[in-house]
Curated annotation (Swiss-Prot):
UniProt record similarity statement: Belongs to the UvrC family.
Pfam families assigned to the protein according to its UniProt record, in alphabetical order: GIY-YIG (PF01541), HHH_5 (PF14520), UVR (PF02151), UvrC_RNaseH (PF22920), UvrC_RNaseH_dom (PF08459)
Keyword DNA repair: yes
Any one of the GO CC terms: excinuclease repair complex
Gene Ontology biological process terms from the UniProt entry: DNA damage response; nucleotide-excision repair; SOS response
InterPro entries, alphabetized: GIY-YIG_endonuc, GIY-YIG_endonuc_sf, GIY-YIG_UvrC_Cho, Hlx-hairpin-Hlx_DNA-bd_motif, RuvA_2-like, UVR_dom, UVR_dom_sf, UvrABC_protein_C
Compartment annotation: Cytoplasm
Role played: The UvrABC repair system catalyzes the recognition and processing of DNA lesions. UvrC both incises the 5' and 3' sides of the lesion. The N-terminal half is responsible for the 3' incision and the C-terminal half is responsible for the 5' incision.
The protein, known as: UvrABC system protein C
PROSITE patterns with a match to the protein in the record: GIY_YIG, UVR, UVRC
Length: 609
């Protein structure tokens, strides 16, 4: 049996499902909606989740949290698709692939419900006859598009309800020729509607027909000697031309197309949508995707296709996709055909110009995802550093943190490691290995004193930069010796703390009792990462040193080899493992090693095995 908490109750519920299409909702013990899905046959689809040893990793994880089942039957699969999108928006289930914050995507609204419509940015969609264009991927790009419209078309910008009971004094936009003054009653509703129709043409991407229409209107106005109106059309044409000159021509065919690029990493995904209108790249939209871990690319792209195009104000005749997901998108295409009256073509090009466009979209998706993950990491790391600053009452943010650890085997071959984190990330160029020189036996505090002394003296001699914080892997005794070394070096101002492994206790200089902070806080997670990295690096160095010395002593037992030749061997092969794997011919390449000595070395190495 799969690990479903309330398996018996769910089996009873399934008996009432039937074979109708609809949506199902898996719920947790607390009533949280975990996953929303749609099905042609509810009974068959829901039973598939009850399989033992399910091949899908994501479903296995979901099974462990399932406690209850709810469902809604629909008349058709198309109705189920629309309902699925609505339920995902409503419940935001964590096991569904979904657009990040899709409820908040902005649109441009043309308020056709008013006699003198406005054009503005909104996140709220009303069913009152207004036209909405979008969704746009972010409010910045939406406002940039709105700004272009308001510079090209002389539409009103005030939010007053028009017409006013009494005409008012026109605003500065009227004086500058950027508004036709509907608040003053200067323009009839019919004439203003002509301008609004042109705005809609622009937003629909029909700029060629818009330019042609404006040219005709300009000529007609000139023939009627209406030079003021002709000048207005001329200015609009010039602004549209200036806008179009900034757009890149990507298709000589001059068609309207959407090109979708996709990238993923860890649990995050990124979709880039290139809107090509009239053969020109008009808009690049970027959509973060959540919940992609363990999901197939077809599922992710299918979810995006559903969430985006079921809410899109305009759907082009052709959509290019980066993977063959026909099965996932056909139900969406069926719904779009009912809504728009035409069936958009879905293509997966494998070569030619369209494949090149897909690669551009995919490259942009990769860059966008990398930038977003970097920003998220930087934000998280900054939060961790701020917390460490507060924990230790540091004067400034600990941009540079170093950590030191001692490694030895019952006091033999003692080494130390020092690692450096810059802005919360490992900085490998700042890693240091130390062979302990002044101590033998088990004396970790003394060894820490030596290493900190050597490190600080080197910074002073080289006029380097002191770290903002030094973390000692150990307790109060080790920390005390590290502080003594800092005082002796004249660098007592460097903040130092000790981090003991046993209970993740933090020791402060001069404090006998340790402090315990929240182990799962961002600051403590970063400190543990730092300490564990120092330990890993130290153990690796200690193992290498032990192996080297073991090999050297083993080779030195060979008659006639001596210290000098054993050193030459180690230098020539640059590693103990390579010596162990060396053939007689390879040994003969080492200066001072003849056939007789090479055979003795091989015999000695066989003893080790």
């Amino acid at each position: 049996m799969p690990e479903i908490l309330n398996h018996t109750l769910i089996l009873e519920k399934i008996k009432n499902l039937g074979a109708s299409p609809g949506c199902y909702l898996w719920k947790s013990k607390k009533g949280e909606v975990l996953y929303v899905g749609k099905a042609k046959n509810l009974d068959k689809r829901v039973r598939s989740y009850l399989k033992e040893n399910h091949p899908d990793v994501k479903t296995k994880v979901l099974q462990r949290e399932i406690f209850d089942l709810d469902w809604i039957a629909t008349g058709t699969e198309k109705e189920a698709l629309i309902l699925e999108a609505t339920l995902i928006k409503k419940h935001n289930p964590r096991f569904n692939v979904r657009l990040k914050d899709d409820k908040k995507y902005p649109y441009i609204c043309v308020s056709l419900s008013e006699p003198y419509p406005m054009v503005y940015v909104t996140r709220k969609l009303k069913d009152n006859g207004d036209r909405y264009f979008g969704p746009y991927s972010d409010v910045k790009s939406t406002r940039e598009t709105l700004d272009i419209i308001l510079r090209i078309f002389p539409v009103r910008k005030t939010r007053q309800v028009l017409p006013l009971p009494r005409p008012r004094r026109p605003c500065l936009n009227f004086d500058m020729g950027r508004c036709l003054g509907p608040c003053q009653g200067n323009i009839p509703v019919e004439d203003y509607k002509v301008i609004i129709d042109q705005v809609i043409q622009f937003l629909e991407g029909r700029k060629e027909s818009l330019v042609s229409d404006l040219n005709i209107k300009m000529s007609n106005a000139s023939e009627r000697l209406d030079f003021e109106k002709a000048a207005r059309y001329r200015d609009m044409l010039q602004r549209i031309q200036n806008f179009r000159e900034k757009q890149t021509v990507v298709s000589l065919e001059g068609g309207d197309e959407d090109v979708i690029g996709f990238a993923r990493k860890q649990d995050e995904g990124q979709v880039i949508l290139l809107e090509i209108r009239g053969g020109r790249l008009e808009t690049k939209k970027s959509f973060p995707i959540q919940g992609v871990l363990d999901a197939e690319n077809s599922e992710i792209l299918g979810a995006f296709f559903r969430d985006y195009y079921l809410n899109a104000s305009l759907v082009p005749p052709c959509i290019f996709i980066p993977a063959d997901i026909q099965d996932e998108v056909i139900p969406v295409i069926d719904v779009l055909q009912e809504k728009t009256g035409f069936r958009p073509k879905i293509k997966f090009p494998k070569g030619g110009d369209k494949r090149s466009l897909l690669k551009i979209a995919e490259k942009n998706a990769e860059l966008g995802l990398s930038e977003r993950l970097l920003a998220t990491h930087y934000r998280d790391q900054t939060a961790s550093l701020k917390e460490i600053q507060e924990m230790f009452s540091l004067e400034r943010l600990p941009h540079i943190i170093e950590c030191y650890d001692i490694s030895h085997f019952q006091g033999s071959q003692p080494v130390a490691s020092g690692v450096m984190f810059v802005e919360g990330k490992p900085f490998k160029q700042g890693y240091r290995k130390y062979n302990i020189q002044g101590y033998e036996g088990i004396n970790d505090p003394g060894m820490i004193h030596e290493v900190i002394s050597r490190r600080l003296q080197r910074i002073i001699n080289e006029e380097g930069v002191f770290p903002d914080l030094i973390v000692i892997d150990g307790g109060l005794t080790q920390l005390t010796k590290a502080c003594e070394a800092a005082v002796e070096a004249g660098a007592e101002g460097i903040p130092m703390v000790g981090l003991a492994k046993k209970r993740e206790e933090i020791f402060f200089p001069g404090e006998n009792e340790p402090f315990i902070f929240d182990m799962n806080s961002p600051g403590m997670k970063l400190l543990r990462h730092l300490r564990d990295e120092a330990h890993r690096f130290g153990v690796s160095h200690h193992r290498s040193r032990r192996n080297k010395e073991t090999m050297r002593s083993l080779i030195q037992e060979v008659p006639d080899i001596g210290f000098k030749r054993s050193k030459l061997l180690l230098q020539h092969f640059s590693g103990e493992k390579k010596i162990e794997e060396a053939t007689k011919e390879e040994l003969l390449l080492v200066p001072g090693i003849g056939e007789n000595l090479a055979e003795k070395i091989l015999k000695q190495l066989q003893k080790k095995e």
